[in-house]
Amino acid sequence: MDPKEIIKQQRLFFSSGKTRNVDFIIDKLSNLKQKIIENEESINNVLYRDLKKSKFESYISEFGILISELDNYIKNIKKWSKRKKVRSSLLNFPSSDYIYSEPYGAVLILSLIHI
């Protein structure tokens, strides 16, 4: 598929609002984590072939960090995505002010696959 078409499809999907659902994000992150774990051996082989990284080094510098970050994100995303009350300015009195955390948009990551 053409990269321009992929970007177009991703922007359409983002504008649908589905990515604002925290449960949707958790599901996708869990799927990503599972796929990484399922393909660990293949990824280790590529890291050894291309960068001469041992399995231990691959785990320490690649898998361990990535899986830990995914676990942390899955665990905390509900808390991070809640609105946060902030102090109101005198100019806005009387008001209630909040910060809403929302996704910015779509990202396209291109990579060569050597599996």
Task: List the predicted regions and their residue ranges.
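N-terminal Rossmann-like NAD(P)+-binding subdomain of aldehyde/semialdehyde dehydrogenases
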Residues: M1-Y104
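Conserved small/polar residues in nucleotide/adenosyl-binding loops
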Residues: I113-I115
